[in-house]
Amino acid sequence: MENEIKEDIGKDIFEEDAGIEEQNYYREGQVKEGIVLPLGLALNDTELYQLSAKKKINLICIMGPAGSGKTTFMAMLYSMFLRQSNNNILFSGSDTIAGFEELLNYIRVSSGKTNVELPRTPKDRKERYYHLKLYINSTKKKSNIILSDIPGETFNACKANKDRLDSEVRCLALAKRIVIFIDGKAVLKNAEWNAAIMDTRQLIMTIRSSEQFRAGTNIDVVISKNDEIVGINSNEKVKRRLMQIENNFQQYYKDCKIRFFRIQALNDYQHLDEGSTSLLDLLTFWVDESSNEQKEVKNQYGELQVISQFNRFMER
């Protein structure tokens, strides 16, 4: 009788509509008997491979220097589903809700500060994968998105070292696309911009020499913090750097699909300029197979609706 009760409760708890999916993996200290609720934290390498064995995943490997906005981007991508409505991409669950909420809490508690800074992802942290289960209306399909949070220190250590890249970023073999962040504020100073372009080129060259590389790999170069440079990009030098960024990567086009985006994660729902891409547009580009990837990603700020008071501090 007791076992029957446990089974019935288990079925209710892990219904897909609850937004919590059953996990068959356990971490040290978890009880393996009776009802086991998933921790909901970020996944480690072992848990990622266990998840990929059960489900088809769309892994997006996010790399970039420390402070370039990678972790903020991931937190705000999750928060987008809490504050905006969209009829095409619907949030339908996550194995790592607690992990996302942990990231988002740093932004919430920093809401009164001039600058919002998330703690750096420690290099030795093994839990670095975040899961989003989405439903795509246009294709009537589900998509399990995995976002990897590769520490900035790992980026620096691996950008010119193939062996370290293969040993420390083992998820490249699973990645559907690689996203390389450039701190948008670097565009304001010539030396910093040249260094950022050089680092990005160097990483792409190392990826191409990696054992995990596949011809035709999707690489998206994302310039972050567009809201901090949008008022300055009327400066001819800054404008020229942004307009000519593609010229710096032409030699890699033959075996990589490289695209370029500018985003402002914290002020995403404010339409700041024609050159920026909303988080929703970027996510749609990544997951909606019905869209033609060769088409230019268009802004759709007019279609976004803020449906709650969540994080209204971002309007300041």
Which functions belong to the PLM regions below?
Residues K141-R164:
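Switch II (G3) loop of P-loop NTPases
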Residues E228-K295:
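Canonical P-loop GTPase G-domain recognition
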Residues E21-L51:
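N-terminal pre-Walker A segment at the start of P-loop NTPase domains
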Residues F81-K123:
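Flexible phosphate/Mg2+-sensing switch loops adjacent to catalytic phosphate-binding sites
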Residues S68-G69:
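Conserved glycine(s) of the Walker
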Residues T72-R83:
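A conserved segment at the C-terminal end of the G1
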Residues A160-L188:
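Inter-motif core of Ras-like GTPase G domains
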